Regions:
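Extended, charge-rich low-complexity interaction segments
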Residues: 195-206
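Short, solvent-exposed amphipathic alpha-helical segments in soluble enzyme
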Residues: 129, 153-157, 184
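Generic structural "secondary-structure junction" signal
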Residues: 120-124, 131, 183, 190-192, ...
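Active-site nucleotide-donor binding segment shared across nucleotidyl transfer reactions
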Residues: 101-135, 139-145
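Non-catalytic surface loops within mature trypsin-like serine protease
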Residues: 53, 141-143, 171
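Helical scaffold of the NTase/Pol beta-like nucleotidyltransferase catalytic core
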Residues: 1-117, 150-163, 167
């Protein structure tokens, strides 16, 4: 995907060409609102993206040309912005939880960052969060965690108590929900660029 990864946020130089967009996806909105890279296969030179509108129900999947990308912000870049959040951001449980999580996440040495609504709000400043919004995080682990690292993951998962935490593990081959893996299921759902699959070995795909 030309170095782009799922959850990257993109701003475009112009409206997506050749796409029938919903009415809410206006030029004015897309000047402010980034597109999120999703997992899918595309033609060479294209990227699969999702558009997000002001309302929870406003979502739209499409493709764009790589040459349309003007600016990119990754989840890892957003992790460095958490400390600079204004005080009024703490009214949202997801952002309040995120701020308290930073020392714990940074101490792991793993690449990490906020995604979902929290990441979108941090990157754009747009008011898309609600009082009951989840906190979505991605952790990059390119190998199965050892016993000590597994305990660290448990600590991270237990640290958020004021909102729902959706912790995704990115293996480099795809992403899966930490909660599924921690539950000890024989197979978990791994989201890949070729589509979702059930696997017992999410770190060993070829």
């Amino acid at each position: 995907m030309h170095g782009y990864r799922a959850h990257d946020l993109l701003w475009l130089a112009a409206m997506p060409a050749g796409e029938a967009l919903p009415a809410w996806a206006s030029a004015a909105w897309l000047q402010q609102a980034p597109l999120v890279v999703r997992r899918a296969t595309t033609a060479p030179g294209c990227l699969p993206v999702g558009l997000r509108g002001p309302a929870r129900s406003q979502r739209h999947a499409c493709e764009i040309g790589v040459d349309q990308v003007l600016h990119r912000v990754t989840p890892e870049m957003l992790s460095a912005r958490v400390a600079a959040m204004p005080p009024d951001a703490m009214q949202y449980a997801a952002l309040a939880a995120l701020r308290t999580m930073v020392p714990l996440l940074d101490a792991t040495g793993w690449a990490w960052g906020p995604t979902g609504g929290a990441g979108f709000a941090l990157a754009s400043g747009l008011p898309v969060l609600r009082a009951d919004s989840d906190l979505d995080l991605v952790l990059r682990l390119d190998a199965p965690p050892d016993a000590a690292q597994t305990e660290v993951l448990r600590t991270i998962a237990a640290a958020v108590t004021n909102c729902r935490l959706d912790l995704q593990i990115d293996t480099g081959h795809g992403g899966f929900a930490y909660a599924e893996w921690a539950a000890g299921r024989s197979k978990i759902l791994l989201k890949t660029d070729q589509g979702p699959l059930l696997t017992a070995t999410p770190w060993e795909l070829v």
